[in-house]
Amino acid sequence: MEQRRIVHIDMDAFYASVKQRDDPSLRGRPLAVGRGEARGVVAAASYEARRFGVRSAMPSVTAKRLCPELLFVPARFDVYRSVSAQIHDIFSRYTPLIQPLSLDEAYLDLTDHLGAYGSATLVADRIRADIHAETGLTASAGVSYNRFLAKLASDYRKPDGLFVITPAMGPEFVAALPVDAFHGIGPAMARKMRALGIETGADLRERDIETLTRHFGKAATFYYGISRGIDHRPVVVNRERKSLGTEQTYLRDLTSEADAHQALTQIAATLWGSAQRRQLQARTVTLKVKYADFRQITRARTLSAPVPSEEVLLETGQSLMAPLFPFVPGVRLLGLTLSGFHAAESPPCDQMELLF
């Protein structure tokens, strides 16, 4: 039986990193996304904050006590969703088999979609490079022959790393790990396992299926498998996304119409290419503008028929942008989004030689 090629991509401190990207004055500073008041909770923490022990789901007062210099910023889910759409568009260039787990992580099945690269490891590295080039953010990747091990691998070299667990490595890699490092085993279950003398993957592997079933019920089969590096769960493709967008943040604020039109031309070309790769037809075009003072506005137009060409996409975007001139203050980000689309049937992909 041929081994699968599964990649798990996990963005590094996603919410906090997006804020630090968009506000350079915050780079290198301990940052928490959430409310800083007495009853607030940390939604996410930058790596600078994590060095002090600040973690997500931690009460804000506890986080502030651990890190007095901690700066709290509000969550910006519209921005996170927009960046997530960019990232998932990058994924779709390499495989249609994508299972998003959240805005900032996903499984990709590359088994039959290695393309000219011939290697899931090379594809994963290319995806990470594309993400950094197009969003300014870093991602970690894990490559393996099943979902469980791919997710473990993506954690192994964080942040901004890549790790591969081959079939030869899998069982012993799992054996050496403490059970509370296993995805799918939460704190309560880990405590229960430790009470039974199960501290590591090797300990878990020593228990037969009957013993595991007696203590863990229906979950026993899953635990029995992962302790041996076995996980047959497929990458489950979610329903089609409802929108597809491209945006760009500029080092120098856009102030002139000429610069803005040139920038929008590039964005429209990128977005149209993404839609064509996915064979999507859309009727609604949305323009996003973020000013230098971080104010943000959107304008949308729904056409009577699907956007037929890159030229019409650009013309629609420009007509939405025209009433916004002059740009005062300048514009630091422009974006276009397509929505209200459906996907045509995709042609079958070529079967490639399977290599890690």
From Swiss-Prot:
Location of the active site: E105
Pfam families referenced in this protein's UniProt entry, alphabetically: IMS, IMS_C, IMS_HHH
Annotated cofactor note: Binds 2 magnesium ions per subunit.
Amino-acid positions noted as binding Mg(2+) in the UniProt annotation, renumbered to this chain: D10, D104
CDD domains: PolY_Pol_IV_kappa
Subcellular location(s) of the protein: Cytoplasm
Keyword DNA repair annotated: yes
Site (Substrate discrimination): Y15
Transmembrane segments: none
Entry's Gene Ontology cellular component terms: cytosol
Classification via PROSITE patterns: UMUC
Gene3D superfamilies in the record: 3.30.70.270, 3.40.1170.60, 5' to 3' exonuclease, C-terminal subdomain, DNA polymerase, Y-family, little finger domain
Protein family per UniProt: Belongs to the DNA polymerase type-Y family.
Subunit details: Monomer.
Protein name: DNA polymerase IV
The species this protein was found in: Gluconobacter oxydans (strain 621H)
Taxonomic lineage: Bacteria, Pseudomonadati, Pseudomonadota, Alphaproteobacteria, Acetobacterales
Gene that specifies this protein: dinB
